[in-house]
Amino acid sequence: MIIGIMKTFLLTICFLSVQTGMVAIAQDKEQTPVYLDDTQPIEVRVQDALNRMTVEEKTRLSYAQGKFSSPGCPRLGIPELWMSDGPHGVRAEINWNDWGYAGWTNDSCTAFPALTCLAASWNPLLAAKYGYAIGEEARYREKDVLLGPGVNIYRTPLNGRNFEYMGEDPYLASELCVPYIQGVQKNGVAACVKHYALNNQELWRGHIDVQLSDRALYEIYLPAFKAAVERGKAWSIMGAYNKVRGTHATHHKLLNNDILKGEWNFDGCVITDWGAAHDTYEAAMYGLDIEMGSYTNGLTSESEFGYDDYYLGKSYLKMVREGKIPMEVVNDKAARVLRLIFRTAMNRRKPFGALTSEEHYRTAYEIATEGIVLLKNGTGKKQPALLPVPQGKYKRILVVGDNATRNLMLGGGSSELKVQKVISSLDGIKAKFGDGVVYAQGYTSGRPMYGRADVIPQVTVDSLRNDAVEKAMNSDLVIFVGGLNKNHFQDCEGGDRLSYELPFAQNELIEALLKVNKNLVAVIVSGNAVEMPWVKEIPSIVQSWYLGSVGGEALADVLSGEVTPSGKLPFSYPVKLEDCPAHFFGEISYPGDSIRQEYKEDILVGYRWYDTKKVQPLFPFGYGMSYTTFEYSKPVISAQTMNTDGSIDVSVKVKNTGKVAGKEIIQLYIGDEECSVLRPVKELKDFRKVQLLPNEEKEVKFTIKPEALQFFDDKQRTWVAEPGKFKAYIAASSSDIRGTVTFEYIQ
């Protein structure tokens, strides 16, 4: 009896406790502001927060509070945003008010290969892995916005920042940036796609005024940004330094209001490049949402707490109070910043991230090995192929070159990285080929300084060259590892290359080495094409890139044949600089007259120019050799006509006819045979990367839709596909056509 009473009593207590808890939870739910309730849709939360904020709080969201931070709304418990460079790795911590490094001991990162290497891989699956891995590192470091990827088009090989971008073709850049962005943002970190738009040179980047046609703008320079927004769903965009048609790009009505936020329905934030804003009214009215700055007032001085002096600081608030800036503009800006904060800093469902994990190093290795491009490998009996280099074949291997030992993560401007580990080219080659490897520096390039370059004494140049030549005489194989580096006036932010040739007397060194040893493999480390006056004399040439933390291991595995090279060039290699379309028209086209420049080549950028003008490049776009060979069947088309709502399939069989496994990149180009306006001979519209074992054959099918036939009609301001005949090219590169089919488009 007593036991029964006790049970009843305990059950009653439990029931009352549960009821009380449920009531408390319900009350808490009712008391939680909507903007803090992450079960609510983001747009509902944004509107609720806006309704609670003062004008001062709304405008304060739009400018920096530190070098890499912008504020939230402390009164409402809305946190600040933290940003970080860059597209290849998460940059070490920077001081609050200056550009000095903070000296932390826990901010080392994985250096991933530069984006030119990713572009050379032609592998969207790797782009997704890249984005997710770098996003994990940013998340672990508690960053909300990762300042990348860069998708500016490769217009000239002199651009100091080409290594950060994805080549000359808008379709290739689009297909790779989308999975990269999606990968980053799965971590609750915003990708900030840059530099919007037309920041295609570093020289005079802060003020050069770009003049171009609407066709060039829409067909060449905007597609990757459009893909980033519409397909990648990028949460932020970085405005560029340069002017476009007289107005700074970072607050530009056509670019930001009409195209980005109008035509593409972008709902994220436009963030300045650091110090890129120049006018309060334009910044407010023409689409800028967050202003960041190189200096604490955004322009000139190093005052300690001058953030209110930014163009979107107190001047912006004053204009709002005076009625010069409508409140709908203020609310739109604030809503965009809040939306970004809710997606990142206030996203409680984001993962914890990871830093310098083995998985990240493996991803970096895969990108590096798939991006390395074999440019040349013998020409026959008189010049036999030197690659791959079997282990044990050569007793003495000489590695020559400053880049073989240089830490190529240093320098370059905002892409500079502090890495946990780095495997240099020499380290990788020694680990692969053993004690028979010796080293000679051969040349020196000086310190990786920003804004200036070391002057190398001639006595040093001669001494290093003589030492390398002497060692080459007594070596069985010479591997030259040279090219460019991250020094100023090379592959570096803030300045362009001064010439197309290799710097630091490398051409003279290569010629001297060839005179004493013909068994020479040249490995060119760069993010740009370089002049090669010795190209016919060297048996084997490899285009390496800035390969990141484990680049030396990746390079050694490709040289040895453990990995078969499968990269293909994401840009054309001109024989001489004047062959490049940006340079064909003289200084007004590049670099401009210091105030203004005209893109006179119009839509004929890269291979579009070489094809149309019948100029032979040194190495064409989409080109890359392998240690195996591939045979293409005759392509088959599914129909001879296509209507406005139809499509056509083009199929081709590809067979590995060599003795080792390899990967081939099959490229589809489309040419308009009958058009009322100038169009290139052909344009890349699709590609596939397939892996094939020896004697294995696979069928690749491409589906062509009317969108692939279109050009931008600048009179109607719309995309148009004119009826008529079209040709589909199946190719191994833009110059290596393996088959064609024709069809007619009918409206």
Curated annotation (Swiss-Prot):
Residues 1-26 form the signal peptide. It comes from the Bacteria. GO terms for biological process: symbiotic process benefiting host; xyloglucan catabolic process. InterPro entries: Cellulose_deg_GH3, Fn3-like, Glyco_hydro_3_AS, Glyco_hydro_3_C, Glyco_hydro_3_C_sf, Glyco_hydro_3_N, Glyco_hydro_3_N_sf, Glycoside_hydrolase_SF. One of its GO terms (molecular function) is beta-glucosidase activity. Its main location: periplasm. SUPFAM superfamilies: (Trans)glycosidases, Beta-D-glucan exohydrolase, C-terminal domain. The keyword Methyltransferase does not apply. Disulfide bonds: none annotated. One of its GO terms (cellular component) is periplasmic space. Keywords: Carbohydrate metabolism, Glycosidase, Hydrolase, Periplasm, Polysaccharide degradation, Signal. It is found in: Periplasm. Optimum pH is 6.0-7.0. Pathway: Glucan metabolism; xyloglucan degradation. Belongs to the glycosyl hydrolase 3 family. Catalyzes the hydrolysis of terminal, non-reducing beta-D-glucosyl residues with release of beta-D-glucose in xyloglucan degradation, leading to remove the backbone 'G' units. Gut bacteria supply the human body with energy from dietary polysaccharides through glycosidases that are absent in the human genome. Xyloglucans are a ubiquitous family of highly branched plant cell wall polysaccharides present in the vegetables we consume. Enzymes involved in xyloglucan degradation mediate the conversion of otherwise indigestible plant polysaccharides to short-chain fatty acids. PANTHER family: BETA-GLUCOSIDASE (PTHR42715:SF10). This is Beta-glucosidase BoGH3A. It comes from Bacteroides ovatus (strain ATCC 8483 / DSM 1896 / JCM 5824 / BCRC 10623 / CCUG 4943 / NCTC 11153).
